[in-house]
């Protein structure tokens, strides 16, 4: 998204926030909401990336603690012509990943242990290239600020249930209607904005990510595995913080309750089809990738150590536990 669209999006979310303030507290409530919204936008610009990483207990890694993963991201960043982002691991079984940061110079990428353990090196490269594409397209600032404001709007909607509106703003039916609007319409509108942001940027990041890693089929295979994993492996932190769902490469919500009624992401099959079409146009055949993707994934992370003694470097047959061990 360019800066104009980003500014329009933030302005729209701010108007939603102010509208809830008006419904709950009249003119005074609207002004208080405006002040809070401006403060949140400024705070979000500088700190929303740190908040999201802390929310998911992300652990920063480097070339010593996660050499293969770190070097993979470094190589992909060089391919994209980007500064080296900070690299994080999230100790979460569900395979997934996201990027955050206000600009390419202050960016971070994060992958779950589930993703690193279950995907092949090529698939991990496709996923991280997709996240770097978000950084290059400057989607990350929008993603993090939207997550912050959407969460706040939903929170105010919940407050409306307890506060029940303001007498000055309307008695009787109008007070009830205002409260219902704050409770239902505003959080729903915030979700629609998240959907609009996510659906357009995901296709663009898929395309650019495929260019960065050099093979669209790496990413298409990864998307299929991640989508299947997200359906059966719940991400409890994401379930508790659904406003951040649009940041992930695949919707992390399991569909419990109404969380998944409207997806924040495009249909995975459509994304895979677009990548496969891109591969065909590049003259890349799918047979090699299919063979790789069909291989057992028990030791399939980019640092996976074979169980045999190939190369004579086996450490007594001990199982490698990953770059975070």
From Swiss-Prot:
One of its GO terms (cellular component) is plasma membrane. Residues 306-325 have a biased composition (Low complexity). Pfam families: Peptidase_M48. Its cofactor is Zn(2+). The keyword Nucleotide-binding does not apply. Zn(2+) binds at residues 130, 134, 202. Binds 1 zinc ion per subunit. It is a multi-pass membrane protein. Residues 288-325 are annotated as: Disordered. Belongs to the peptidase M48B family. NCBIfam families: PRK01345.1, PRK03001.1. This is Protease HtpX homolog. It comes from Brucella canis (strain ATCC 23365 / NCTC 10854 / RM-666). The gene is htpX.
């Amino acid at each position: 998204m360019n800066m104009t669209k980003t500014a329009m999006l933030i302005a729209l979310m701010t108007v939603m926030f102010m509208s809830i303030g008006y419904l709950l507290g009249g003119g005074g409530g609207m002004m208080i909401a405006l002040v809070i919204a401006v403060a949140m936008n400024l705070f979000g610009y500088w700190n929303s990336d740190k908040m999201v990483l802390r929310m998911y207990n992300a652990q920063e890694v480097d070339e010593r603690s996660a050499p293969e993963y770190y070097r993979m991201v470094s190589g992909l960043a060089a391919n994209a012509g980007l500064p080296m982002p900070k690299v994080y691991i999230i100790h979460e079984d569900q395979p997934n990943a996201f990027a955050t940061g206000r600009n390419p110079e202050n960016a971070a990428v994060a992958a779950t242990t589930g993703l690193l353990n279950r995907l092949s090196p090529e698939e991990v490269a496709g996923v991280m290239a997709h996240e770097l594409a978000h950084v290059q397209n400057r989607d990350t600032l929008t993603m993090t600020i939207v997550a912050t404001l959407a969460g706040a709007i939903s929170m105010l909607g919940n407050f409306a249930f307890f506060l029940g509106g303001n007498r000055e703003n309307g008695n009787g039916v109008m007070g009830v209607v205002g409260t219902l609007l704050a409770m239902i319409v505003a959080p729903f509108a915030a979700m629609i904005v998240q959907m609009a942001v996510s659906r357009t940027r995901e296709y663009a990041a898929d395309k650019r990510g495929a260019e960065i890693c050099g093979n669209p089929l790496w990413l298409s295979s990864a998307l299929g595995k991640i989508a299947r994993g997200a359906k059966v492996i719940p991400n409890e932190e994401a379930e508790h913080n659904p406003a951040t769902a649009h940041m992930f490469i695949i919707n992390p919500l399991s569909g419990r309750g109404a969380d998944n009624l409207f997806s924040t992401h495009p249909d995975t099959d459509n994304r895979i089809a677009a990548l496969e079409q891109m591969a065909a146009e590049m003259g890349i055949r799918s047979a090699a990738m299919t063979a790789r993707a069909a291989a057992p994934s028990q030791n399939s992370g980019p640092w996976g150590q074979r169980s045999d003694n190939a190369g004579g470097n086996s450490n007594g047959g001990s199982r490698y536990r990953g770059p975070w061990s």
